[in-house]
Every structure is written in structure tokens, then in C-alpha cells.
Design a protein with these regions (language model features):
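A short small-residue
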Residues: 50, 152-154, 184
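Accessory C-terminal segments flanking Radical SAM cores
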Residues: 209, 228-319
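Conserved alpha-helical substructure of the radical SAM core
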Residues: 6-90, 95-105, 110-112
Length: 319
């Protein structure tokens, strides 16, 4: 007789306990993420997307391919009567993609706010990239925001995650951005994300910013975004339809209610759309070749849905 317990996150509609699995209806497109590719200049100890200098399972997307989706966002905004969404670029390290500046300028020229997630290390600090960024800032000012990944406010813990010397290089990039008047945010990691521990972490970042002359308000959750750690082995509950009321959480506040991400898989002829930034590889979250195909409900059939979004309360957008 088979006595093994049902596996969690195994059925799109039903949890291991036989309860109805929660889903999130699409509300409106507020952020369109474009994954620039999984190649990165460093390899972090706990990278959720497993980027590295050799990891190219998500290929560089081109400016022409990105433009196709920007065209579609304009059509969707016109049809729905909503404003243009923010365009977010993530990787990998976006500044390794040779079309990064061109894609950012295309989005800005169309009237989008543009957010680029970066480690602010050598790919961003190359002279040509710096010159291009300065030109974009001069032309579009605060419509362009760069969010710098700084895992901890101490060099020791940041470098434990990202490698020796990474803290110093990231601080060089962060200070260059601050000194040149860019709209900035910082993304860090938190072990608990609540209460006294988060207050301590925000105070630590505040001291660092003050010491380095970086004008960021560490108390503002949009200026300093603290993400929960994403432990693949951690025990997490499945999210049922009853959980929204029990937890007093609005499904409309989940990332997948208001955002989608474009990825280009290695060897594929064209990009596809996935539900969110956290799940680029799971086939059940690949929603189609166009934005129009991708706007259905998303079933929360993954541990990241529970830990990172519903329970962690995280969002990747700038707002």
C-alpha cells in the first residue's frame, strides 16, 4: 500500500490537502518586465534565477524584439484606457546585453517609466555605458530609475553572497549614479522582513548611505526594497482560496495581477511571456507568445508564489 503523502504544488487546481488552490486574476498591466538574458558578470551563492558568467539558457533579447512588446503595450493601453506601464529590465546583469541602452531609450522615448535592475559593477561602469546613461538621464531625468542590488550593508555579508570585492565595486557604481543625479533605489535581502529585524537592517543601510553620501531614504520601502530569502528547501504552505481572507491579503496586490515578463529561451526563434520575474523556467507559467495571450488568471502552484509573494509581501516593481 502506498502511504506517501501527496506532494505539495503538484496539481494546478488542488492542494495536497485537497483544497481549492488560489489563483490571481489579471487586473491591468502596470509593469512589463523584459529579461535581458541570464548571463551575469558574477555568480551569487543564492541567485533565484541561477545567473552566472556562463549561464545563457535565457538569451540576450534584442532591441527589435523588445520593441515588438512595447508596440503591444501601447495597443493594450489604448484599448483599456489605462496609462502606459512601467518597463522593467532584469537579468542576469542587464548591462551585459549589448542592446540595453537602446532598449531603455526606446521605452523612455515612448513615454514609459523605465527601471533597470543592476549590480552596478563593471558592466555598468564601462565608459560607453556610463556615457549612454548620462545621456538618458539628461534627456529623460527621473523617468529612468536604476535599482542597485546590495545584499547587505556590510562588506562581509554582501561579499559572502556575491564574491570577494563585489561590495566595493557595487559601492563604486552606486556612488557614481548618486553623484550624477540618477533616480535610484537599492534592493537588499532580509532574513525576516518584519519587526525589529527589518528596522535594524534599514538602520544599517541608512548608516551606510550617510557615510557614502548616497541620498536614499532607507525607511522608504520603494527606495530600499528588502526581499525575503528564497530558500528552495524551506517548508512553505500552499495558498488556498480561503487564504486571502485568513491572511487579509488582496490578490490584486500580487505581482501577477499587474505584471508580466518577456523572456527569450536559448535556441528559440522568438521570445515568450511568463507570469512573473520569479518563474522564468517553469512551463506552467509560460503564458503565450504575446501579451494578449498572457492576460488570464495565474494559478499559485509554486512555492515562490507562497513564500515570496503572498506571505513575503514582495513586489519587484518600482512603485
Amino acid at each position: 500500500m502506498n502511504t506517501s503523502a501527496p506532494r505539495k504544488f503538484n496539481h494546478p487546481d488542488v492542494t495536497a490537502r485537497g483544497e481549492a488552490r488560489a489563483s490571481v486574476a489579471f487586473r491591468q498591466l502596470e509593469t512589463l518586465w523584459i529579461n535581458t538574458g541570464t548571463l551575469c558578470n558574477i555568480e551569487c551563492a543564492n541567485c533565484y534565477i541561477h545567473s552566472s558568467p556562463t549561464e545563457d539558457r535565457l538569451s540576450y533579447i534584442t532591441a527589435a524584439e523588445a520593441a515588438h512588446f512595447l508596440d503591444e503595450t501601447a495597443a493594450l493601453a489604448l484599448a483599456s484606457g489605462s496609462g502606459l506601464p512601467e518597463i522593467g529590465f532584469t537579468g542576469g546583469e542587464p548591462f551585459m546585453n549589448p542592446d540595453m541602452l537602446a532598449m531603455a531609450e526606446d521605452g523612455l522615448a515612448r513615454g514609459h517609466k523605465v527601471l533597470i535592475l543592476t549590480n552596478a559593477m563593471q558592466p555598468m561602469l564601462r565608459p560607453g555605458i556610463k556615457q549612454g546613461l548620462l545621456a538618458l538621464r539628461e534627456r529623460y531625468d527621473a523617468a529612468l530609475t536604476l535599482r542597485v542590488s546590495l545584499d547587505h550593508y556590510t562588506e562581509a555579508l554582501h561579499d559572502a553572497e556575491r564574491g570577494a570585492g563585489s561590495f566595493a565595486k557595487t559601492m563604486e557604481g552606486l556612488k557614481w549614479l548618486a553623484d550624477n543625479g540618477f533616480s535610484l533605489a537599492v534592493a537588499g535581502r532580509t532574513t525576516s522582513g518584519e519587526g525589529e529585524e527589518e528596522t535594524k537592517e534599514r538602520s544599517g543601510y541608512a548608516a551606510l548611505f550617510a557615510r557614502e553620501g548616497v541620498a536614499l531614504d532607507s525607511k522608504d520601502p520603494s527606495s530600499l526594497v528588502l526581499f525575503p530569502e528564497m530558500d528552495e528547501e524551506a517548508e512553505v504552505p500552499e495558498i488556498t482560496t480561503a487564504c486571502w481572507g485568513i491572511l487579509d491579503v488582496d490578490p490584486g496586490a500580487m505581482m501577477c495581477a499587474t505584471s508580466r515578463m518577456v523572456v527569450k529561451r536559448k535556441g528559440m526563434a522568438a521570445p515568450v511571456v511568463v507570469a512573473c520575474t520569479l518563474l522564468p523556467d517553469d512551463p506552467q507559467f509560460e503564458l503565450g507568445a504575446s501579451l494578449a495571450e498572457s492576460l488570464g488568471a495565474v494559478k499559485l502552484n509554486h512555492r515562490h508564489c507562497a513564500k515570496f509573494c503572498v506571505l513575503g509581501g514582495a513586489s519587484c516593481s518600482a512603485s
